[in-house]
């Protein structure tokens, strides 16, 4: 399983970021073929004197590296990537890696 993590920097307008992400970007991302899972979070700063460099984090899961690459090159993947310029005013850093499970997560 491959996890693609998108780290979004602090946006110029957080309310506009939230609105666009929820109403447009998440809808586009959910259409990416081969997507096995998709979760997001807003990280809290662990030290109040040092705010988090990231406003928002998205994790997308794919079966393997080839599936992720194919998904990102698909029309749906390209649409989601192209949408970043419409709301990610604080920048977006993408990293990917093989998932190692030490203790399974249970949502719900």
Please annotate each region the language model reported.
Residues 1-108:
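Macromolecular interaction modules
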């Amino acid at each position: 399983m491959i996890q693609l993590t998108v780290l979004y920097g602090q946006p110029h307008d957080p309310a506009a970021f939230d609105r666009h992400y929820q109403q447009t970007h998440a809808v586009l991302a959910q259409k990416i073929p081969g997507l096995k899972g998709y979760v997001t979070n807003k990280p809290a700063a662990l030290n109040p004197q040092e705010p988090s460099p990231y406003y928002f984090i998205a994790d997308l899961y794919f079966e393997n590296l080839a599936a992720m690459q194919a998904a990102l090159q698909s029309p749906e993947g390209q649409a989601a990537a192209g949408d970043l310029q419409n709301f990610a005013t604080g920048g977006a850093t993408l990293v990917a890696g093989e998932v190692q499970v030490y203790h399974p997560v249970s949502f719900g």
